[in-house]
Amino acid sequence: MERILENAMYASRWLLAPIYFGLSLGLLALALKFFQEVVHVLPNVFALSEADLILVILSLIDMSLVGGLLVMVMISGYENFVSQLDIDESKEKLNWLGKMDSSSLKMKVAASIVAISSIHLLRVFMDAQNISTDYLMWYVIIHMTFVVSAFCMGYLDKLTKH
């Protein structure tokens, strides 16, 4: 009975595979939104103010960071929890493939969240004259919460590895 239960639990890791595949569909949706934004802004690029153009570029950077985060979580999560990726040796391989454990993945995710939050904060500051000070204060508090959390996670990770 114990053996059957253990085998069933071990096999249940495959339930994560469709979830990671679903993330790839999320990446596709993000790419479509990215190119929709590019196609939308290009005809009007000369009519945009510098500040508006910077806001659009920040949105594109934000989407690229989220896309990178999706790829990282999707691939390393699959490798860590489901199965090793069998990639042909003749194909290009990501240098971190097979090297990112769940601890380093958490740190990369935390760093990505801080970077994404920084871009959102910069976007908010660029429109600061139209935003209430309470909103700005809470945005900074939330961002600093992400920063402190990422720092604490890194510090705890360093403590547990030594």
UniProtKB/Swiss-Prot annotation:
Membrane-related topology note: Multi-pass membrane protein
Q: What Pfam families does the annotation carry?
A: UPF0114
Specify whether Membrane is a keyword of the entry: yes
Q: Name where it's found.
A: Cell membrane
The GO cellular component terms are:
plasma membrane
InterPro entries registered for this protein in UniProt? UPF0114, UPF0114_bac
Question: Coiled-coil ranges per the record?
Answer: none
* Keywords carried by this UniProt record: Cell membrane, Membrane, Transmembrane, Transmembrane helix
First-listed, main subcellular location of the protein, grouped into a coarse class: membrane
Q: Which family does it belong to?
A: Belongs to the UPF0114 family.
Kindly provide the name given to this protein in its UniProt entry. Answer: UPF0114 protein PP_0682
Q: Which organism is it from?
A: Pseudomonas putida (strain ATCC 47054 / DSM 6125 / CFBP 8728 / NCIMB 11950 / KT2440)
